[in-house]
């Protein structure tokens, strides 16, 4: 906005000012004497202002010369020169205007009046018209605007003729007012106001310059100070680091020289280790654990607490009985005739004893030392102690018999003395409190104690004697070790002296005689233990089980609920653990050759199950044994369903799996097979009856009876593996070498069975199985299966002028195009490829696009549930699939062909092609079996495998 006062420094102009009005218009503005107006820039024509201006001019020049050397610098001097030139031109311009005529002067004054007076009117400020045509007023305004430092664009300065304003027509027309802009310097000022304005601006610039200079200087000082401070800090850190390094070096030297520093360092290391263990323990506690594992641990801890309470009560009862027996023995010893006789003989022979003491004193000390050393050795040796604990229970009975026969012999006394010392040490060990373990896996440390070892020995011996006396029985009386025999010989030699009888009588008088009632003590101990130990249904006590330390548990600790099925090499039962009440699966291994040792098939199964731990493989918990070694059981997690029986139930209800469920099951199966193959394990018996499904939808592979580890290079194994319906064609054609592709073929058959709820190749024999495979997939040849003609079965057939029926086209797409997608067909064809080298691997099948297309595999937890037949107590119906081969030369018959009709001329008419001619009997059904063979083969030979009755 333009300053309303008429100047930048706020000076007010009145109408009485000489520079405001022209001479011809004094009367026109007389009534507005009190109003305030803005003085336009114009030159004064009065003569009195000349000396004053000259004086100011000289003062300005002096001031300019004075300030030229001041702070302003070259920029201020240049600006002053510019303004000085402007003033000289202005004076020259107005000097020419004064020489004009009065009319021209009046017109000029009128022009200046309109230029100054009409500008502040509101309509002229609000409306800004377009730039007018070039005129003198516009030129004059822009000329002043440019010279006063405004931002308007410079215009070209035109020189007008001297008689421009003196024209006749120019005075009649009104002068056009130029477009005003709201500029700070839009109004022109006189020389004094301009001087003051310039001075104020210069002072302001100088002040800003000085202020900026001081600010920069202060900032530089601050930066320098901070740099100095930072450098000092870095220097201090450098010195601290160097001193710390030197101190460390000195400490290392002290540590190597002084053992105290080493001890201190070890103590610090231990403290750090303990802190680290505490942190790890806190992290482990924060990590969420499996609920089943926590429940199992809680049950084990509860069983541990219960056993601890039983031990405490048994210990208290035993202590009370000991006190009672001591009181009875003291009372009976005081009145017994043997005690009286011993006291009398001791009184008579007291002088003899004193005399003979120096002679045998050294021998007696040596014997005592040897006995103490023997006792310490026996205590430290766990194996000898476990054997002697059984014999110590029978020592009183043996001593009573020995005293009747050899009452005066010193040998019996030495054995009695040794048994007394051992029994005392055992009683002291019983009284000591045993440290209880912290974790369930370390509960078995209790078994290492002498008390627990003695208790478990006695209980197990009693239970074994009650259950089966004809089975393996532990001999309770065992021979003493060579160390004890040597001590006994030394005792006999040392005690062969006249004073030995007196010493024995004195010992018998001073010491207690716990062997007087040994039978009662043993009965009471066993009775107290029987009251505290848990028993099974028949009343037979169960031994304490501590995993990780003790051997195999007994199968009697499990309650058999019902039989589930019979596997390849054993029968599976559903049972309940009597300690934890958990439902488990017990698989009994067949021990047909137990006299020759543990069967190799059972060892392979246990080994592969322990090596192949995976979420989709059955979990082995432990191995338990029966009363005899011919009964061995594998304890596994119980899974509710097997897929064979489940699919039969669904088929009876006219149900089938959804595509997402098929993908979920196949994906879990492929994961398990891939894990086995990564661990160099062949399952060799994959089928739906060996696939288990839990209520949570988790598929688990079971029955590892035919599983075997393989290696590189691949060895020759028996081809009589895998159940017939899921057997690969290379096995059916007696290939001597096979590997993981045989499991992949079985997975392909199972995948097809998931899709159609029926077996894909339900052959009755190897011949029928091959015929079904070739009919479904087409007959192979050397082009699609390199090395096909080199297989033993094919080579023998060709040598005998026999061949298979040709099926050129695969029927797989025709049968499954409505049951799965194109990607599903591609996966099925990849799994059922003839050439084992071109067949998909389990890892490659997992990456197939079938599992990535919609619908995606469902989550196992979303799987529907069905009631398990085994839980209802009903025996599960046997699956309709054939049993797997038992292996070796004792394999059983896998199936039989259809009955063969013998036609006239004793020729077979079951569709078999003899030579190259078809027999037309029985309707000419030569395509029913598709196998071409020579004539004269009996029915029994056709039913045998694996070589199709051909001797290779």
UniProtKB/Swiss-Prot annotation:
The modification Phosphotyrosine is found at residue 447. It comes from the Eukaryota. Coiled coil: none annotated. Residues 379-400 have a biased composition (Acidic residues). The modification Phosphoserine is found at residues 439, 442, 449, 881, 886. It catalyses: L-seryl-[protein] + ATP = O-phospho-L-seryl-[protein] + ADP + H(+); L-threonyl-[protein] + ATP = O-phospho-L-threonyl-[protein] + ADP + H(+); L-tyrosyl-[protein] + ATP = O-phospho-L-tyrosyl-[protein] + ADP + H(+). Residues 401-412 have a biased composition (Polar residues). One of its GO terms (molecular function) is protein tyrosine kinase activity. Residues 457-470 have a biased composition (Low complexity). GO terms for biological process: positive regulation of antimicrobial peptide production; positive regulation of Toll signaling pathway; regulation of cell cycle. One of its GO terms (cellular component) is nucleus. A motif (Nuclear localization signal) lies at residues 51-56. Residues 558-851 form the Protein kinase domain. InterPro entries: CDK, CDK11/PITSLRE_STKc, Kinase-like_dom_sf, Prot_kinase_dom, Ser/Thr_kinase_AS. Keywords: ATP-binding, Cell cycle, Kinase, Nucleotide-binding, Nucleus, Phosphoprotein, Serine/threonine-protein kinase, Transferase. Its EC number is 2.7.11.22. SMART domains: S_TKc. ATP binds at residues 564-572, 587. It is an enzyme of class 2 (transferase). It holds the Pfam family Pkinase. The active site is at residue 685. Residues 53-66 have a biased composition (Basic residues). Present throughout the early embryo. In late embryos levels are highest in the CNS. Acts as a negative regulator of the normal cell cycle progression. May function in regulating proliferation by the phosphorylation and subsequent plasma membrane targeting of galactosyltransferase. Belongs to the protein kinase superfamily. CMGC Ser/Thr protein kinase family. CDC2/CDKX subfamily. This is Serine/threonine-protein kinase PITSLRE.
């Amino acid at each position: 906005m333009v300053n309303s006062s008429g100047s930048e420094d706020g000076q007010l102009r009145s109408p009485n000012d000489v520079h405001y009005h022209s001479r011809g218009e004094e009367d026109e503005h007389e009534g507005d004497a009190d109003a305030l107006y803005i003085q336009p820039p114009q030159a004064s024509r009065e003569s009195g202002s000349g000396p004053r201006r000259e004086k100011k001019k000289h003062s300005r020049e002096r001031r300019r010369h004075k300030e030229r050397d001041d702070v302003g610098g070259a920029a201020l001097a240049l600006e002053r020169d510019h303004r000085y030139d402007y003033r000289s031109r202005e004076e020259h311009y107005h000097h020419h205007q004064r020489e004009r005529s009065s009319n021209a002067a009046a017109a000029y004054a009128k022009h200046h009046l309109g230029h100054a007076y009409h500008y502040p009117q509101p309509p002229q400020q609000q409306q800004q018209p377009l730039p007018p045509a070039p005129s003198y007023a516009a030129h004059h305004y822009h000329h002043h605007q440019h010279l006063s430092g405004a931002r308007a664009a410079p215009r070209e300065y035109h020189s007008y003729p001297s008689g421009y304003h003196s024209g006749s027509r120019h005075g009649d027309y009104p002068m056009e007012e130029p477009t005003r802009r709201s500029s700070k310097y839009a109004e022109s000022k006189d020389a004094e106001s301009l001087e003051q304005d310039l001075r104020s601006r210069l002072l302001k610039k100088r002040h800003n310059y000085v202020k900026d200079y001081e600010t920069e200087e202060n900032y530089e000082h601050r930066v320098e100070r901070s740099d100095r401070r930072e450098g000092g800090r870095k220097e201090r850190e450098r010195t601290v680091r160097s001193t710390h390094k030197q101190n460390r070096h000195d400490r290392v030297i002290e540590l190597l020289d002084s053992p105290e520093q080493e001890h201190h360092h070890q103590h610090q290391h231990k403290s750090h280790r303990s802190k680290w263990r505490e942190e790890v323990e806190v992290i482990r506690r924060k990590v969420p654990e499996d609920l089943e594992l926590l429940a199992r641990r809680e049950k084990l801890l509860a069983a541990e607490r219960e056993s601890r309470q039983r031990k405490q009560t048994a210990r208290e009862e035993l202590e009370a009985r000991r006190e009672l027996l001591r009181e009875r023995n003291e009372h009976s010893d005081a009145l017994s005739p043997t005690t009286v006789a011993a006291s009398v003989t001791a009184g008579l022979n007291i002088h003899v004893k004193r005399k003979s003491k120096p002679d045998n004193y050294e021998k007696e000390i040596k014997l005592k030392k040897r006995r103490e050393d023997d006792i310490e050795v026996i205590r430290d040796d766990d194996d000898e102690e476990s054997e002697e604990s059984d014999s110590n229970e029978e020592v009183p009975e043996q001593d009573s018999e020995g005293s009747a026969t050899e009452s005066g012999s010193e040998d019996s006394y030495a054995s009695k003395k040794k048994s007394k010392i051992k029994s005392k040490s055992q009683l002291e060990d019983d009284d000591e409190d045993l440290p209880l373990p912290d974790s369930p896996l370390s509960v078995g440390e209790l078994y290492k104690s002498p008390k627990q070892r003695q208790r478990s020995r006695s209980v197990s011996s009693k239970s074994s004697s009650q259950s089966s006396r004809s089975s393996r029985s532990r001999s309770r009386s065992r021979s003493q070790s060579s160390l004890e025999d040597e001590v006994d010989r030394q005792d006999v030699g040392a005690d062969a002296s006249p004073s030995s009888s007196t010493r024995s009588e004195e010992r018998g008088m001073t010491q207690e005689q716990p062997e007087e009632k040994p039978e009662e003590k043993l009965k009471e101990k066993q009775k107290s233990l029987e009251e505290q130990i848990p028993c099974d249904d028949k009343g037979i006590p169960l031994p304490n089980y501590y995993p990780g330390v003790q051997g195999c548990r007994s199968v009697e600790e499990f309650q058999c609920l019902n039989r589930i099925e019979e596997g390849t090499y054993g029968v599976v039962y559903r049972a309940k653990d009597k300690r934890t009440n958990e439902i488990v699966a017990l698989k009994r291994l067949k021990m047909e050759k137990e006299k020759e040792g543990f069967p190799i098939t059972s060892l392979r199964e246990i080994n592969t199950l322990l090596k192949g731990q995976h979420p989709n493989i059955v979990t082995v918990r432990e191995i338990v044994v029966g009363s005899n070694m011919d009964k061995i059981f594998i304890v596994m997690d119980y899974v509710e369903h097997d897929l064979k029986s489940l699919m039969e139930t669904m088929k009876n209800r006219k149900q089938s799996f959804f595509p997402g469920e098929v993908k979920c099951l196949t994906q879990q199966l492929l994961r398990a097979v891939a894990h086995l193959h990564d661990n160099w394990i062949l399952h060799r018996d994959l089928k739906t009856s060996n696939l288990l499904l839990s209520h949570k939808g988790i598929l688990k592979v079971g029955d590892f009876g035919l599983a075997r580890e393989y290696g590189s290079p691949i060895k020759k194994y028996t081809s009589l593996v895998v159940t017939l319906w899921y057997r690969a064609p290379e096995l059916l054609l007696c290939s001597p070498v096979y590997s993981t592709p045989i499991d992949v073929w079985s997975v392909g058959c199972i995948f097809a069975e998931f899709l159609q709820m029926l077996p894909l190749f339900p052959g009755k024999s190897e011949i029928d199985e091959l015929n079904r495979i070739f009919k479904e997939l087409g007959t192979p040849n050397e082009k699609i299966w390199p090395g096909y003609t080199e297989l033993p079965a094919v080579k023998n057939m060709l040598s005998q002028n026999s061949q298979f029926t040709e099926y050129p086209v695969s029927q797989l797409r025709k049968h499954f195009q409505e049951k799965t997608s194109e990607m599903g067909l591609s996966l099925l064809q990849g799994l059922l490829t003839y050439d084992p080298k071109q067949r998909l691997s389990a890892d490659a099948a997992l990456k197939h696009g079938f599992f990535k297309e919609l619908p995606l595999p469902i989550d196992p937890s979303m799987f529907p549930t069905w009631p398990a037949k085994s839980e209802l107590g009903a025996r599960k119906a046997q699956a309709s699939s054939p049993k797997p081969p038992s292996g070796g030369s004792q394999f059983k018959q896998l199936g039989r062909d259809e009955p063969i009709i013998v036609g006239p001329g004793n020729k077979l008419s079951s569709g078999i092609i003899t030579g190259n001619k078809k027999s037309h009997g029985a309707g000419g059904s030569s395509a029913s079996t598709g196998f071409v063979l020579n004539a004269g083969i009996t029915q029994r030979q056709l039913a045998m495998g694996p070589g199709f009755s051909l001797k290779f």
